[in-house]
Amino acid sequence: MNSELNTPLSAETTLPTPALQGFRLMRFEVLNWGTFDQQIWHLAVEGDNSLLTGNIGSGKSTLVDGLTTLLVPTRKLAFNKAAGAEEKERSLESYFHGFYTSQQDDYGKARPVGLRGKDHYSVLLAQFHSSALQQSVSLAQVCWLPPAEKRVKRLFLVAEQPLTIASHFTGFGDKIAGLKKRLKLQDGCEQFDTFPPYQQAFCKALGLGSDGKALDLFNQTISM
């Protein structure tokens, strides 16, 4: 897998204005997420208001779901709502494996077909920056499938600095333990095994409050 390739995705942006305060999304990156396969893909919005456009099936909802996965608690995730899809049409597992079609097995039952098997990892990463505070915050999630397991596991990270997939999430070998060990040496980088403490950490870092209302509003807006 050549994860060093870094492929830009297009998003129309407007010029920044003084009204754009607080932490703004600067860059969003994905690796092995849905049909964004085998290399790093990124959106560089640089804190501006942006409009994501593309043909049907080009991956717009896949990217939106990736950003939602970084910010919304697992129990509240409703993938592909931005495209008006039915519940359970997509899942964390389907994005991890890159399911893109289905085919019938020998018994006539439809089975999903994916771009990837079990021996890989997926990464979601978002960089935020506050011009007023001159501070950066990065959120990341790493997904992998342990041997002999069917459920995807996740590592959650909050860092008070700009991170990138190419610089911080590649070249650590074939064990997630190697990545965890490397990231422990990164200043201002916290690791979590579950979503609740991760959410508490990034809400504090981004100034979102502790009641979860800002994230609930974000999730409702995405679903409209």
Feature map (PLM): residue ranges:
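Extended heptad-repeat soluble alpha-helical coiled-coil rod/stalk domains used for dimerization
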Residues: 208-224
